[in-house]
Amino acid sequence: VLCAAAAFLTMSGCKKAPPGTLTGISISYSGMCYDDTYGFSIRNDPVDGCLFSCNYKDDEWVELENIPVEDTHWQEALALAEKLGLESLPDEKKNSPGLFITDETLVSVCLIYKAPDDEIIYRYLDADGNTRSTLRDFFEDLAGQLQTEGKRGDA
């Protein structure tokens, strides 16, 4: 149950904070990090060694897909994000070609960080038309982390 904890995280929005280790991104249609209607996230889970996406549906988080963390698999994660409609710009107001069907306006992007003291930090970004580049930056950043972490040889 990888996503169970997500439902209990702060629902009041994202606080701005200096970044630590980038561990995930959440796309919201309501301004909250984890939207309880159309929210979903793609996160880097160092414990289970995979990227996963989650959808909040019928009052519970549902895991959609696992992607093993290897040097090139961030590209598959980006492809998954595109499939799920993450790159739809806020002003397009059209049904997602992916799994999330809504005509609501995308209003927030949260980057999820893990600070050196293990605090989880949510950095809120306004979805102002730069959503696509924000997501690409996230995956490029994540790719760099995965390439670095993948060479440590940790079991």
Residues covered by each model-derived region:
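N-terminal export/targeting and maturation segments
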Residues: 14-54, 61, 68
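Sec-dependent bacterial lipoprotein signal peptides
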Residues: 1-12
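Short amphipathic beta-strand/extended segments with alternating polar/hydrophobic composition
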Residues: 38-43, 63-69, 116-130
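Short polybasic amphipathic segments
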Residues: 47-55, 105-112
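Short, well-ordered, aromatic-rich surface patches in folded extracellular/luminal domains
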Residues: 14-32, 91-155
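A short-motif feature that recognizes glycine-rich, charge-decorated loops
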Residues: 52-89
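Generic "edge-of-domain/loop-turn" microfeature
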Residues: 32-34, 47-49, 59, 74, ...
